C-alpha cells in the first residue's frame, strides 16, 4: 500500500472515530426529562414548548387557545357578585391571559425565526388574532363587573396580591371601562386597529432586504475577513453588502474610506420600508393620539409614561432635554476633533461631519489616538469562547449552572437549548434557546423573547420559564470561527442578562414575572452588565486570540478602550438622546384633526440633536422601537442612570464585577422579584441606600460645570 493509501486509510479511521465520538456525546446529552424529578421536588414544572409544525397547526393552536380563554372568561363573568373571591376573579384573569399568551409566544418565535415563509405568514396571522383578542378582553364588561364586585368588598390584601388588584383596576380604567358604552366601543376599535398596524410595521421591517453591490475599490479600507465572509463576493469584483444586516452595515460605516460608499449604504438603510411604513406609522400616531385624547390624557406620551417610573411625558422630555444640554460641551468638543480628521482627509477645512461619517472618523480616532483597532480586536472574541466565558461568569456570580440539553424540535440546525439550575440546591429554574446568527427572514436585531413566563399555576406548582435569545452575530468564515466585535460582546452580555432576569423569577403572577417591569427600568440590569466587558479582570477569563489562546488582551489596550469609550461618549449619547427626543416628539400633544407627518417631525430633530442627515431618508420607517417602545425610548437613558448607580455595588465589592455576594444580591433583590413589588424598593434594597445620578453623569463625561444643565436626571424625587 502506498503512502497516499496509508494516509487515506488513516484519515478514514480518524473520521469514523470522530463521528462515533460525536454520536456518543449526543447520546450522553441530557433531556428535560432528566430534570423533572428535581423540579417536582421543588414543586415546580418544566415545559418544553410544543412547537407547531405546519401553518394550519399554528392557526388551529391560536384558535383553540382563544376559545379556551373565552370559556374561562365566561366563567369569571357568570359568577354571583355576592360570592366572588380574589382567586375567582383577579387571579383567574391572570391565569386566563397567561395561558392564552403561551400560544401567542410560540407564534411570535415562528414569525421571527422560521425559514419557511408560509410558516411565518401563518404565525403573523396568529399573532394578529391574539392581539385583537387581547384588546377585546379589556372590554368584557361581565369580567370587569365581577372584579369590581370583589374590589368593592374592600378586601384586606397585601404585597403582590394587593398590587395585582390595584393594577388590574388601573388597566380597566386605562382601557376606557369607565367611559359610556358607545365611547368605550370606539376606543376598543381604535386599539384593535392600532394593534394590527403595529404587526404590519414590524413585518415590513423584517421583510426589508437591501442588497447593495460594490466593487472592491468602493470598499477600500475594509478588512480582508469581510470580503471572505459568506455571501459577500457575488461576482467578478462584485461584493454584495446587505444594508439591513447590522454587522455588515456597521463594518462598512466604520471602515470604508470612500464617503460616497458610506453615504450610499446609509441612505439605503435609512429608507428601508419607507413606502410601506411611513404611511403605517402616520396612521399609528393618529390612532395613538386619538386613543389618548378619548381616555382623557393630553398625549400618548402621558398615557404611556403613567405606568412607568417617569409618570408623565413632561418628566421624560425634561430628563432628555436636560441631558442633551448637559452633554453639549462634550459633544461639541468630540465633534470638533472628528471634523479635524475629516478636514485633513478631504483637504477641505470646512468639511462637516455628516451622519454617515461619525462611525468612520470615530474609528480612525480610536486607532490613531487610542491605538484601538476594532477589527484587530475581533481576534480576541471568537463566539464560542465568549459564550462559554460569559456562561462561566454568570454561573459563578449568580449561583447558577447552565447545561446544554437535547432540543426535541429545532427550527434551525445550530439551535441550542440549555437548562438552568441553582448551583447550590440543584433546583431547575428554567430553559433558554440560542439562535445566534443571521439568515433571510429572521428577526434582524438582538433580543430576548419570552416563550413561557414564570407563574404560580392554579394547581399550586410553579411554572419555570423558557425564553429564546435571537441574535445576529457575524457567522463563521471558512476556517476562522465567528469573530465578534467588542460591541457584539457587550450586546451578548446585555441580552443574556434579560434571559436571566426572566429565568430566575420568583414572582407569583405572570404579569409581574421576570422582565415584566416598568419600561423605563427593564433595561437597567442588562445595561449594568455591559460594564463587565470593559474590565480587564473579567476579559481575562475568556478573551484570548483564537490563533494563540495564550495571548490575552493587553492591559494597555483595555485601558485605551475605556479612554476611547469616554472620549466618544458625547457622540454616542447624543445619538441615543436624538432617538429618545424624536420618539417623544412624535407622541407629544397633537391637534386631533391635524394629519401626522412622522418624517417632518423626526428628521429635523435628528439634525438638531445629532448630525446632518440626507433629507431623502426616513429613519423612522425602520426604527422598530416605535412599535413596542413607543414614547418609551427615553427609558434607555433613564435606565442607564439606574444601571450606573447599581454598578457601584460591584465596583465597591471585594472581587469587583466577579463578586459572588454582589451577584447573589442582584439575583435576590432585582431579578427574582420582577415587578412583584415597586421597583424603587428593589433598587434601594440592592443599593442599600437612595439612588444617585452621580455615577451616570461621570460615565457620560458630564463634569461639575455641566451638572446644572443636567440636574433633573432621574432621582428618587423625580420618580
Regions found by a protein language model. Give the residues of each.
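Short His/Asp/Glu-rich catalytic/ion-coordination signatures at enzyme active sites or charged loops
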Residues: 41-57, 107-126, 147-189, 242-278, ...
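Short pre-active-site segment immediately N-terminal to the catalytic Zn-binding motif
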Residues: 474-492
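Boundary at the C-terminal end of the N-terminal hydrophobic targeting segment
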Residues: 24-26
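Bacterial N-terminal signal peptides that target proteins for export
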Residues: 2-13
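Active-site-proximal, well-structured secondary-structure segments within enzyme catalytic domains
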Residues: 164, 193-196, 203, 208-242, ...
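Bacterial N-terminal signal peptides
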Residues: 12-22
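N-terminal helix-rich structural modules
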Residues: 28-230, 239-240, 650, 656, ...
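C-terminal, non-catalytic "cap/extension" segments appended to globular domains
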Residues: 32-60, 64, 367-368, 385, ...
Amino acid at each position: 500500500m502506498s503512502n497516499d493509501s496509508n494516509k487515506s486509510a488513516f484519515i478514514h479511521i480518524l473520521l469514523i472515530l470522530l463521528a462515533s465520538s460525536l454520536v456518543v456525546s449526543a447520546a450522553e446529552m441530557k433531556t428535560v426529562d432528566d430534570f423533572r424529578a428535581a423540579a417536582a421536588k421543588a414543586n415546580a414544572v418544566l415545559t418544553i414548548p410544543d412547537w407547531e409544525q405546519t401553518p394550519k397547526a399554528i392557526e388551529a393552536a391560536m384558535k383553540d387557545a382563544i376559545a379556551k380563554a373565552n370559556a374561562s372568561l365566561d366563567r369569571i363573568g357568570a359568577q354571583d357578585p355576592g360570592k366572588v373571591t380574589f382567586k375567582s376573579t383577579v387571579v383567574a384573569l391572570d391565569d386566563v391571559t397567561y395561558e392564552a399568551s403561551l400560544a401567542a409566544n410560540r407564534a411570535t418565535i415562528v414569525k421571527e425565526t422560521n425559514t419557511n415563509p408560509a410558516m411565518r405568514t401563518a404565525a403573523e396571522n396568529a399573532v394578529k388574532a391574539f392581539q385583537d383578542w387581547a384588546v377585546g378582553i379589556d372590554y368584557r364588561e361581565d369580567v370587569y363587573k365581577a372584579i369590581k364586585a370583589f374590589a368593592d368588598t374592600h378586601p384586606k390584601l397585601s404585597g403582590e396580591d394587593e398590587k395585582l388588584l390595584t393594577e388590574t383596576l388601573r388597566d380597566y380604567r386605562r382601557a376606557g371601562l369607565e367611559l359610556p358604552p358607545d365611547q368605550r366601543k370606539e376606543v376598543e376599535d381604535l386599539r384593535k386597529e392600532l394593534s394590527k398596524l403595529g404587526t404590519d410595521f414590524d413585518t415590513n421591517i423584517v421583510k426589508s432586504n437591501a442588497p447593495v453591490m460594490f466593487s472592491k475599490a468602493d470598499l477600500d479600507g475594509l478588512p480582508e475577513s469581510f470580503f471572505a465572509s459568506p455571501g459577500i463576493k457575488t461576482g467578478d469584483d462584485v461584493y454584495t453588502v446587505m444594508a439591513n444586516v447590522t454587522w455588515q452595515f456597521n463594518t462598512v460605516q466604520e471602515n470604508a474610506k470612500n464617503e460616497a460608499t458610506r453615504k450610499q449604504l446609509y441612505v439605503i438603510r435609512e429608507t428601508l420600508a419607507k413606502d410601506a411604513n411611513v404611511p403605517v406609522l402616520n396612521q399609528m400616531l393618529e390612532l395613538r393620539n386619538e386613543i389618548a385624547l378619548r381616555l382623557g390624557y393630553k398625549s400618548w406620551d402621558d398615557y404611556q409614561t403613567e405606568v412607568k417610573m417617569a409618570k408623565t411625558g413632561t418628566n421624560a422630555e425634561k430628563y432628555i432635554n436636560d441631558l442633551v444640554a448637559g452633554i453639549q460641551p462634550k459633544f461639541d468638543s468630540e465633534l470638533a476633533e472628528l471634523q479635524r480628521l475629516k478636514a485633513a482627509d478631504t483637504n477641505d477645512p470646512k468639511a462637516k461631519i455628516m451622519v454617515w461619517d461619525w462611525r468612520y472618523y470615530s474609528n480612525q480616532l480610536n486607532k490613531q489616538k487610542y491605538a484601538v483597532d476594532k477589527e484587530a480586536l475581533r481576534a480576541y472574541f471568537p463566539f464560542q469562547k465568549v459564550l462559554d466565558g460569559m456562561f462561566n461568569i454568570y454561573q459563578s456570580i449568580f449561583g447558577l449552572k447552565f447545561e446544554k440539553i437535547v432540543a426535541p424540535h429545532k427550527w434551525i440546525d445550530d439551535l441550542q437549548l440549555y437548562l438552568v439550575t441553582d448551583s447550590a440546591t440543584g433546583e431547575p429554574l428554567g430553559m433558554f434557546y440560542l439562535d445566534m446568527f443571521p439568515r433571510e427572514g429572521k428577526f434582524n436585531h438582538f433580543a430576548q423573547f419570552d416563550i413561557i413566563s414564570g407563574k404560580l399555576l392554579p394547581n399550586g406548582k410553579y411554572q419555570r420559564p423558557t425564553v429564546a435569545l435571537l441574535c445576529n452575530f457575524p457567522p463563521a468564515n471558512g476556517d476562522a470561527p465567528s469573530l465578534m466585535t467588542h460591541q457584539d460582546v457587550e450586546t451578548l452580555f446585555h441580552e443574556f442578562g434579560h434571559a436571566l432576569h426572566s429565568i430566575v423569577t420568583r414572582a407569583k403572577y405572570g404579569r409581574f414575572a421576570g422582565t415584566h417591569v416598568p419600561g423605563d427600568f427593564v433595561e437597567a440590569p442588562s445595561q449594568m452588565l455591559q460594564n463587565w466587558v470593559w474590565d480587564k479582570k473579567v476579559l481575562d477569563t475568556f478573551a484570548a486570540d483564537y490563533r494563540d489562546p495564550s495571548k490575552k488582551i493587553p492591559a494597555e489596550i483595555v485601558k485605551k478602550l475605556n479612554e476611547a469609550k469616554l472620549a466618544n461618549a458625547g457622540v454616542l449619547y447624543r445619538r441615543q438622546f436624538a432617538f429618545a427626543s424624536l420618539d417623544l416628539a412624535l407622541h407629544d400633544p397633537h391637534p386631533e384633526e391635524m394629519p401626522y407627518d412622522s418624517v417632518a417631525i423626526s428628521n429635523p430633530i435628528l439634525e438638531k440633536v445629532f448630525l446632518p442627515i440626507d433629507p431623502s431618508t426616513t429613519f423612522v420607517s425602520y426604527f422598530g422601537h416605535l412599535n413596542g417602545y413607543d414614547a418609551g425610548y427615553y427609558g434607555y437613558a433613564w435606565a442607564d442612570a439606574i444601571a450606573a448607580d447599581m454598578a457601584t455595588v460591584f465596583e465597591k465589592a471585594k472581587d469587583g464585577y466577579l463578586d459572588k455576594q454582589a451577584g447573589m444580591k442582584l439575583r435576590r433583590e432585582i431579578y427574582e422579584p420582577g415587578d412583584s413589588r415597586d421597583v424603587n424598593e428593589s433598587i434601594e434594597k440592592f443599593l442599600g441606600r437612595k439612588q444617585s445620578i452621580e455615577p451616570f453623569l461621570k460615565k457620560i463625561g458630564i463634569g461639575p460645570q455641566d451638572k446644572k444643565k443636567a440636574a433633573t436626571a432621574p432621582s428618587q424625587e423625580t420618580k
